[in-house]
């Protein structure tokens, strides 16, 4: 049986303790990262939308790094958006900076009506590189 191990970034934000969940779970050579939002250190949403997206990717980067991964190790992405039509351009600006060369990860974008005060959330599955 494959062991599951919780992974947390350095300087993790208060949402993990408050809502009792792991930033990511390592299972074998896969890393399942919980939805990352654009929260400030106190767990509150960043009000500027593009900055919120950037913070979500910063939080994702920190979680990946805690498991020895980078954005290049991501194989599957699911993102959640409260207003996809009006947010698309800002999201694509940040996405294209981070995933600038193929092969790109799979990506599913989902429009939602509620993200607990946030407007963007991103969860991923990554393959953990061999040590």
Swiss-Prot record:
Gene3D superfamilies: RutC-like (3.30.1330.40). This is RutC family protein YjgH. GO terms for molecular function: deaminase activity. SUPFAM superfamilies: YjgF-like (SSF55298). Belongs to the RutC family. It comes from Escherichia coli (strain K12). GO terms for cellular component: cytosol. Pfam families: Ribonuc_L-PSP.
């Amino acid at each position: 049986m494959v062991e599951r191990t919780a992974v947390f970034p350095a300087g993790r934000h208060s949402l993990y303790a408050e809502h009792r969940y792991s930033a990511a779970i390592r299972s074998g050579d896969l890393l399942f990262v919980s939805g990352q939002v654009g929260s400030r250190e106190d767990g509150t949403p960043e009000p500027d939308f593009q900055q919120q997206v950037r913070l979500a990717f910063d939080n994702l980067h920190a979680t990946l790094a805690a498991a020895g991964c980078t954005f290049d190790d991501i194989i599957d992405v699911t993102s959640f958006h409260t207003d996809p039509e009006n947010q698309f351009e800002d999201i694509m600006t940040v996405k294209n900076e981070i995933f600038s060369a193929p092969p790109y990860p799979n990506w599913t974008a989902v429009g939602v009506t509620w993200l607990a005060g946030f407007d963007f959330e991103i969860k991923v599955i990554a393959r953990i590189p061999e040590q």
